[in-house]
């Protein structure tokens, strides 16, 4: 289930707002310019589906976003717990950074934790299957896929080079808890 926790940026252990309600999550994130919505597949997706089959199941929503935002590239990324580069991939996203384009991700399966630093607040957004999140360009954030990552996501890019992060060099991401998906017992 999707979850939003909001913290003061100096109290990483004590959220002052917690919700698993779609409408509340959407409303709170809208206040800081973030789009959060749910999509449903128009056809079944079988295990082992190709990127083309995954995108076909969400074609209407994908086309709407491309038309609205002018995305030039759309792809599918799939990360499993047995990925040999999982630690390297996780570390790449764990520090606070921003992009010069919107970061838009749709979770087809699995989960991940986007954390946004806006003003003096930190918004921790757990995204799960059927969640779309769109973080505006210039927004400070980090992403934690967990120690044993599992997700399939559709990614949208306006830059042909794809993901380019501009890191702030602050330690704020290190002060906040790491992502432990529901059902896991300990952090790694």
Swiss-Prot record:
The keyword Amino-acid biosynthesis applies. Ni(2+) binds at residues 97, 99, 103, 141. The record marks 102 as: May play a role in transmitting local conformational changes. Its EC number is 1.13.11.54, 1.13.11.53. It comes from the Bacteria. The lineage of its organism: Bacteria, Pseudomonadati, Pseudomonadota, Gammaproteobacteria, Lysobacterales. Keywords: Amino-acid biosynthesis, Dioxygenase, Iron, Metal-binding, Methionine biosynthesis, Nickel, Oxidoreductase. Binds 1 Fe(2+) cation per monomer. The keyword GTP-binding does not apply. InterPro entries: ARD (IPR004313), ARD_bac (IPR023956), RmlC-like_jellyroll (IPR014710), RmlC_Cupin_sf (IPR011051). The record marks 96 as: May play a role in metal incorporation in vivo. Fe(2+) binds at residues 97, 99, 103, 141. GO terms for molecular function: acireductone dioxygenase (Ni2+-requiring) activity; acireductone dioxygenase [iron(II)-requiring] activity; iron ion binding; nickel cation binding. This is Acireductone dioxygenase. Catalyzes 2 different reactions between oxygen and the acireductone 1,2-dihydroxy-3-keto-5-methylthiopentene (DHK-MTPene) depending upon the metal bound in the active site. Fe-containing acireductone dioxygenase (Fe-ARD) produces formate and 2-keto-4-methylthiobutyrate (KMTB), the alpha-ketoacid precursor of methionine in the methionine recycle pathway. Ni-containing acireductone dioxygenase (Ni-ARD) produces methylthiopropionate, carbon monoxide and formate, and does not lie on the methionine recycle pathway. Disulfide bonds: none annotated. Its cofactor is Fe(2+); Ni(2+). CDD domains: cupin_ARD (cd02232). Monomer. One of its GO terms (biological process) is L-methionine salvage from methylthioadenosine. The record marks 105 as: Important to generate the dianion. The gene is mtnD. Pathway: Amino-acid biosynthesis; L-methionine biosynthesis via salvage pathway; L-methionine from S-methyl-5-thio-alpha-D-ribose 1-phosphate: step 5/6. Belongs to the acireductone dioxygenase (ARD) family. It catalyses: 1,2-dihydroxy-5-(methylsulfanyl)pent-1-en-3-one + O2 = 3-(methylsulfanyl)propanoate + CO + formate + 2 H(+); 1,2-dihydroxy-5-(methylsulfanyl)pent-1-en-3-one + O2 = 4-methylsulfanyl-2-oxobutanoate + formate + 2 H(+). Pfam families: ARD.
